[in-house]
Amino acid sequence: MNHLTGLFGLPASTLVELLDLAAGYREGLNREPETFAPLLSNRRIALVFFENSTRTRFSFELAARHLGAGTLSFTAASSSVSKGETLSDTIRNLEAMKVDAFVLRHPSSGAADFVTSITNRPVINAGDGTHEHPTQALLDILTLRSYFGKIEGLKIMILGDILHSRVARSNILGLKTLGAEIAVCAPSTLLPGRIDQLGVQVFTNLDKALAWADAAIVLRLQLERATGGYIPSLEEYSAGYGLTDEKFDRLKRLMPVLHPGPINREIEISNMVADRIQPPGYSSSMLMEQVTNGVAVRMAVLHRLLAK
């Protein structure tokens, strides 16, 4: 593996290798004090972000530092991109500064694959358009594996704006490769055409989807969808597809809930569901475990691509 631009085409053995490596790093993150071998000392990683990010950018930066690497943080608004510089010129200039790898977030689908065609440095996709977000899917899968002890045979329901979600696509690819069953749940206007051809079950009723599932991955609803004709209103979306205590009370069994963040509270997920770490109740929020696992997964990816 020379790059990580997506989970499409990656064999189960590679995914398991990354997950096992990440699980070891997560144990290290939970120790006091944190101590890691400086495997990437004298390496320099360019964090090239053309879109805003909190969790992804900071966790890549922490992951690099834990492994002894330095980082260069790039944001489009404060760079020559604001003066018209192209993506390829940006990458070539950073490469001329002798950076060792690129972590790229970009609004255009396929941007990460394009960058692999103009550099021989490792490229890690931190989210490109509606295409993929592979490290988010890996941290979600690690969170689920840690909770259940396995992935094979699990029934995972992905809830929300499937149509525009790179997180959904990467999770479907990774989870199916590892043997999980996948369902998606959303209003029909937020489902891609021919989504069933990906081998997933489709629900438009949340109660039925919850009854089917072992775990739920909730997606962020981009609020402009309410004015773009995709949903009647935020209130109606929340009533039909928001995860609330009341919906879990009807289910009457425990279910872990994941969310990639940031959360639109009281729209896609209620405060009580988002903030509940342990029972009582029937939902168990895994949001903070996801954040910790995000650092561990990104350490594993950097290790796999850069350690000699």
From Swiss-Prot:
Binding site for carbamoyl phosphate: 55-56, 105, 133, 136, 261-262
Domain of life: Bacteria
Top-level taxonomy: Bacteria, Pseudomonadati, Chlorobiota, Chlorobiia, Chlorobiales
Protein name (database record): Aspartate carbamoyltransferase catalytic subunit
Pfam families the UniProt entry points to: OTCace (PF00185), OTCace_N (PF02729)
Gene3D superfamilies: Aspartate/ornithine carbamoyltransferase
Reactions accelerated catalytically: carbamoyl phosphate + L-aspartate = N-carbamoyl-L-aspartate + phosphate + H(+)
Organism in which the protein naturally occurs: Chlorobaculum parvum (strain DSM 263 / NCIMB 8327) (Chlorobium vibrioforme subsp. thiosulfatophilum)
KW Transmembrane (keyword) present: no
Encoding gene (name): pyrB
